[in-house]
């Protein structure tokens, strides 16, 4: 098992101590030095798995005359090891530091800190020395791993968007000069991936750039990824736990450099008989799950492309090398999560200095732990797609897009949730820190401590929350789950209509949500994600007749100014009633078909034009009914 910590956003280094460093914008990276001697000291990190190996990575701009050194220490049996040097960068040159004397507890083997016993905690630090120009630190990463469970068989292959082959131009290390050809599998693989990202460099140039000036070798994992990171790419060493994680990278259009080891006859069709360590590029998967690669050990360009049997490749990579990979890509397209109780999604990268209930720039709100995809960085802002709030754009479904402040995001891995906050606001206790979480926030409940529930957080810490504030995910839609939708919507009764509002946590308790935000939160509590705005909610819903309506189903109204566009949604409460966040009245309220349209539900048909009497001057609108509650896939 392995786990990788990626430190690329301000929240990722929460709790660290810095000296002589100045935080910089998210677009630029993490810090820049502001004195001749600087230090970054991480907090003590408790790993989610016991580990016996640790590998570090960094991306930085290190001017000539400056240096950067990464060190780590681990705790074994309540004893801290000394600090071990994982690598040094002096200007554009790299230096390894093999342990002079093997510690009783651990030692450095090229690029890996190896432990003689398992550890659960580690700490790392970066030491900087600077002359006139500052060093800019863009990224840090640490991978911890153990050999537990490596021998299990891989999961059966399931076809998906990873059944594809990325167009990675082939290179053969065997065509390089004799002094390189047998030792540059890593630089050759790196060259293929850099070329894929429109950074064409000759293999020999890459080899000299990543060469370890201590051992004169070319294959130090940390140095190879550090070099790639100097081209404004996100680049780090990781270990993936199975091929399914590689498949996700391929599906997103990102080739993966992988390390393999095998004995004679163990990897059919390989250009070399055996190897203790060799790097190649995974470019895709076949229909039956076999692995498509560009293997730089091939004797010529035409034979670089290979297809390796899935089972044999899995052994050579995951079992023999613990799934080691280089993950290299632009920042755009990477996944992250929201690390604050609520984040405002804006149409432009401008801060919300003052709350305006009808601010047209305010698009939506995201809750703690929600998954996002990064699209663009601009200063201290990042354009994202909200993966749990779908939108129908350019003919297909994708995350709702907008700008949030980078201080709100984290690259931590969110534990798989099994519970959800069911009250409007709930206090989460993490040591001396308190977080005010919104209804709809999803959490991983680990167990109970009296009247409190213990939950796992993305930064691998735990916290406590009142058990009565949580609800387990439903695994079926029934009368109880439908009633829970109504109960959740009722939490907002009497609050003000808030354009883009989608959270129980607002600057003032009187501030509520917009119509589709109310629906989104009510459905999240039963574990169902639906699109963000009313138009998309109607588009993806299952149409219903008026006689088919059940509690919790939805009612849609067209825009009076554009009858082809849906602009309002309400939640059916049974009988003749519904609950809504009504813009014309400025609040979340109950109403009825008879009151609003002059006729009861029984006399109003799907797609009929009705008169909306909620306006001072009644308006004509089309009305529709829809459901997500019986035939839609449900979140497990």
Task: Indicate residue ranges for each PLM-predicted region.
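Noncatalytic regulatory segments and standalone regulatory/sensor domains
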Residues: 7-26, 48-49, 90-93, 114-158, ...
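Conserved active-site-adjacent core of cysteine acyl-enzyme catalytic domains
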Residues: 200-330
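N-terminal capping segments
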Residues: 164-174, 429, 441-447, 451-546, ...
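Boundary regions of SH3-family modules and the immediately adjacent low-complexity/disordered segments
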Residues: 330-343, 354-357, 368-371, 378, ...
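Active-site-adjacent structural segments surrounding the nucleophilic cysteine of cysteine proteases
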Residues: 10, 127-218, 270
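Aromatic- and glycine-rich peptidoglycan recognition patches
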Residues: 280, 291-331, 417-418, 430, ...
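Beta-sandwich interaction modules
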Residues: 4-17, 37-55, 59-144
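...with weaker cross-activation on analogous glycine-rich loops/strands in unrelated enzymes
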Residues: 220-274, 278, 528-595
């Amino acid at each position: 098992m392995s786990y990788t910590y990626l430190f690329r956003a301000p929240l990722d280094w929460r709790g660290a101590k810095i000296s002589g460093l100045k935080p910089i914008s998210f677009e630029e990276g993490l810090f820049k030095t502001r004195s001749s001697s600087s230090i970054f000291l991480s907090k003590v990190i408790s790993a989610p798995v016991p580990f016996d190996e640790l590998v570090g990575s960094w991306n930085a701009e290190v001017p000539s005359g400056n240096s950067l050194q990464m060190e780590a220490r681990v705790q074994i049996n309540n004893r801290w090891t000394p600090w071990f040097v994982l690598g040094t960068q002096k200007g554009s040159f790299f230096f390894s530091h093999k342990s002079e004397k093997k510690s009783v507890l651990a030692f450095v083997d090229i690029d890996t800190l190896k432990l003689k016993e398992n550890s659960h905690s580690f700490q790392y630090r970066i030491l900087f020395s600077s002359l006139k120009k500052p060093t800019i630190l863009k990224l840090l990463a640490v991978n911890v791993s153990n050999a537990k469970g490596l021998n299990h068989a891989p999961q059966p292959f399931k076809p998906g968007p990873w059944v594809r082959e990325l167009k990675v131009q082939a290179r053969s290390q065997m065509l390089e000069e004799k002094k390189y050809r047998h030792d540059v599998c890593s630089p050759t693989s790196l060259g293929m991936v850099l070329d894929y990202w429109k950074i064409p460099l000759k293999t020999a140039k890459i080899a000299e750039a990543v060469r370890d000036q201590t051992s004169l070798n070319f294959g130090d994992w940390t140095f190879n990824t550090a070099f790639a990171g100097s081209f404004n790419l996100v680049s780090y060493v990781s270990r993936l736990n199975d091929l399914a994680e590689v498949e996700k990278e391929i599906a997103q259009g990102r080739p993966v450099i992988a390390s393999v080891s095998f004995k004679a006859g163990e990897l059919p069709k390989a250009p070399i008989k055996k190897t203790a360590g060799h790097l190649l590029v995974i470019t895709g998967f076949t229909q039956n799950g076999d692995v498509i690669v560009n293997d730089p050990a091939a004797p010529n360009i035409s034979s670089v492309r290979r297809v390796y049997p899935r089972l044999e490749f899995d052994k050579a990579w995951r079992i023999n090398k613990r799934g080691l990979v280089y993950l290299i890509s632009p920042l755009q397209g990477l996944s992250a999560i929201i690390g604050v109780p609520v984040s405002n999604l804006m149409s432009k990268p401008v801060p919300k200095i003052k709350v305006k209930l009808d601010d047209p720039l305010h698009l939506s709100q995201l809750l703690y732990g929600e998954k996002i995809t990064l699209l663009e960085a601009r200063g201290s802002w990042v354009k994202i797609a909200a993966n749990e709030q779908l939108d129908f754009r350019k003919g297909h479904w994708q995350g709702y897009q907008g700008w949030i402040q980078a201080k709100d995001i984290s690259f931590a891995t969110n534990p798989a949730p099994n519970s959800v906050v069911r009250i409007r606001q709930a206090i989460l206790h993490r040591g001396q820190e308190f977080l005010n979480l919104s209804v709809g926030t999803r959490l991983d409940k680990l167990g109970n401590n009296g009247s409190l529930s213990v939950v796992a957080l993305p930064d691998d810490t735990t916290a406590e929350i009142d058990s009565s504030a949580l609800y387990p995910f439903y695994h079926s839609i029934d009368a109880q789950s439908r009633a829970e939708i109504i109960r959740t919507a009722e939490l907002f009764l009497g609050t003000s209509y808030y354009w883009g509002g989608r959270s129980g946590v607002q600057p003032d308790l009187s501030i509520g949500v917009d119509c589709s935000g109310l629906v989104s939160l009510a459905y999240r509590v039963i574990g169902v994600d639906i699109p963000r705005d009313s138009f998309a909610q109607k588009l993806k819903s299952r149409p219903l007749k008026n006689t088919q309506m059940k509690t919790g189903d939805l009612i849609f109204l067209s825009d009076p100014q554009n009858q082809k566009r849906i602009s309002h949604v309400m939640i059916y409460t049974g009988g003749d009633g519904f609950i809504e966040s009504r813009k014309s009245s400025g609040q979340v309220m109950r109403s009825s078909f008879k009151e609003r349209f002059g006729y009861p539900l029984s006399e109003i048909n799907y797609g009929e034009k009705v008169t909306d009497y909620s306006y001072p001057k009644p308006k004509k609108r089309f009305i529709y009914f829809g459901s997500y509650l019986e035939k839609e896939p449900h979140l497990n």
